[in-house]
Amino acid sequence: MNKSKLLILKNELSSYNVSVYNRIAEEYDLTVGFFSDKSKENCYFKKMLFDIKRIGPFVFVQRLFRIVRGYDLVCFVPDLHIISYCMLPFLPRKFKLLNWSIGFRVSYVHPYLTGRKHVFLDWVFQRVLSRCDASIFYMERAKDFWQNTSLNLNRVFVAPNTTSVVPIGFDEKRKKNFLFVGTLYKGKGLNLLLKAYKEAIDIAQIDNELHIVGDGEEYQNIIAFVKDNQLEGKVVLHGAIFDEIELAKHFADALLCISPTQGGLSVPKSMGYGVPFVTKSSAITGGEIFHITPGDNGILYDEDKELSGILVDACRNPKKYLAMGRKAKQYYDDNATIDHMAKGAIAAFDFALNH
């Protein structure tokens, strides 16, 4: 039986997308179109690199309207800057059309607040979504933004935004370190983490090491902080690690994974490795922090001053956080694996194809 032809339109093909697309390719004849390729893994689907033209902040994909005619389904990221993608719902078509995204406009200016006031661009975004045969959101919570609007939520599916992990077991004796994983830039609140860690040492003489995995603009500032505060041997910088097996070793040694002001894909990654994630309740997110049930499988805190107390408590009561880690792992296995993400998307594709 021939598979239906599916084209997924992205800005960038990232490494974390590959495993879910490989899973989707088992059900559909999948092509992924993009204008930037950051993938390194084996791709069991077709790839298509687009020619683009940029005019200011806007992107136009060359010959896109001709390309899409050869597919049964087309699924695009509804980024309003990519004019060619967002024009698709308003053109005559024979193929079924879907969108796949956070679910509403989120940025540093518009954080993940489902109760915020709608503005003109939200109306434009809604028009784009409403003209599609189905929508795929990263998290169930995003539907709340569209309550009491004309968007048909019966045509909205959820594919929990997540990332893959490798099996590492759960050895309580190894789990002692505090861990940060991600790009080192100011938006992550690394300065707040370092300050809280220093305060925790001053308060309780904790001996848990802080391991930082990543690279970026804050790298030299972190080195300077470590030197100025005599934290050599306590704060360990590893640089960027792209090998998942090597990264997994750091999670295997971690009691907590912490990112004060941003909670993205590191949240399900950490949970998948059985490590509670710690971040502010107001952290910048694509919705991933809503995987966390505060105090059960992770920690959400409100004030910066609380973080040092959390680190001290983890040092003094590690069993409490080990139990959280086990619950985090169970949550990931039950709700947030790559297979859950793929099944959510496939359900949307099947629905669109048959309605």
Task: Provide a role label for each language-model segment.
Residues 240, 280, 294-305, 312-319:
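Conserved acidic donor-binding segment of nucleotide-sugar-dependent glycosyltransferases
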Residues 125-169:
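Donor nucleotide-sugar binding/catalytic pocket of nucleotide-sugar-dependent glycosyltransferases
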Residues 19, 176, 183-201, 217-223:
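A conserved mid-protein helix/loop that constitutes part of the nucleotide-sugar donor-binding site
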Residues 276-284:
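Short hydrophobic beta-strand element within catalytic cores of glycosyltransferases
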Residues 221-241, 295:
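Nucleotide-activated donor-binding/catalytic signature segment of Leloir-type glycosyltransferases, i.e.
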Residues 105-127, 165:
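Nucleotide-sugar donor phosphate/pyrophosphate-binding loop at the beta->alpha transition
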Residues 316-350:
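A charged, aromatic-enriched C-terminal amphipathic alpha-helix characteristic of glycosyltransferases
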Residues 249-262, 275-276:
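Acidic donor-binding loop of glycosyltransferase active sites
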